[in-house]
Design a protein with these regions (language model features):
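Leucine-rich repeat
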Residues: 78, 98-104, 120-126, 142-148, ...
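Leucine-rich solenoid repeat scaffolds
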Residues: 207-243
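LRR N-terminal entry segment and analogous cap-like coil->beta motifs
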Residues: 55-132, 149
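Conserved hydrophobic beta-strand positions in leucine-rich repeat
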Residues: 82-86, 107-109, 127-131, 149-153, ...
Length: 243
């Protein structure tokens, strides 16, 4: 009879357990391969970007090997670049390749030919950005960089800094010799400690009176009057104001 040919319950349970174990093992193996494929894909893209940027004079710093990355996969390209500098590489203008460097924490483009910084808006890990002595005039894309702590725009032709009000973690802002007139938007930067406004046409610094975190302010060669500077100093007794 058919009933006598059926495997005992213990055997059936063992078979079910073995099948479940096999299925779980296959799923885990697939996940591992997917992760390794993603790492390999990112490494390949970064390898191309780095080769291109190195040919233009860039220098790099890479992260330490992540704990999850096997030793045999550890190469310069499998680790994310955390710092890139192209300082005074006058021919460098196109920042689009940098969008592939998602682990980037610091970027120095001072003295380059960069004009458009919109491709940098997706660099969510970026903490420091130097754009001094560039032709960058539109900084609105930088409002997306929520982790940014340092921003240097010395002598860049910037006029509108209202978008920077979204940078809640910003601690250092250099607007020396820019075309900025209105700094009222900066009143939203509650963590700002250093602000450089020298050699600008800024005349009204009253909005900065709410920045209790501010410790250093430069207003040399501005339109700020002695009376305004005095009032600001009274509102911010712990801030060193230089004019």
């Amino acid at each position: 009879m058919r009933g006598k040919n059926r495997p005992p319950n213990a055997i059936r349970r063992r078979l079910r357990f073995s099948l479940r174990t096999l299925l779980v093992g296959m799923l885990l193996l697939g996940l591992v391969f997917a992760i390794l494929a993603a790492i390999a894909g990112e490494a390949k893209r970064q390898r191309m970007v780095i080769a291109d940027l190195k040919s233009q004079g860039a220098d790099f710093v890479f992260e330490d090997r992540p704990a999850y990355l096997p030793q045999w996969l550890d190469t310069e390209y499998s680790r994310r670049a955390t710092y890139i500098t192209l300082t005074f590489e006058r021919k460098f203008a196109d920042v689009r390749p940098l969008a592939e460097c998602q682990g980037l924490e610091e970027l120095d483009l001072s003295g380059t030919a960069v004009v458009d910084v919109s491709p940098l808006a997706g660099l969510s890990q970026l903490e420091g950005l130097e754009l001094s002595w560039t032709q960058v005039s539109d900084v609105s894309p930088l409002g997306e960089l929520s982790n940014l702590q340092t921003l240097e725009l010395n002598e860049a032709p910037v006029t509108d800094v209202s978008s920077l009000s979204a940078l809640e973690k910003l601690e250092y802002l250099d607007l020396t010799a820019t075309n900025v007139l209105d700094v009222s938007a900066l009143a939203a930067l509650r963590n700002l400690e250093y602000l450089l406004l020298s050699h600008t046409l800024v005349a009204d610094v009253a909005p900065l009176a709410t920045l209790q975190s501010l410790r250093y302010l430069e207003i040399y060669d501005t339109q700020v009057t002695d009376e305004q500077a005095k009032q600001l100093q009274q509102a911010l007794p712990h801030c060193h104001i230089f004019r």
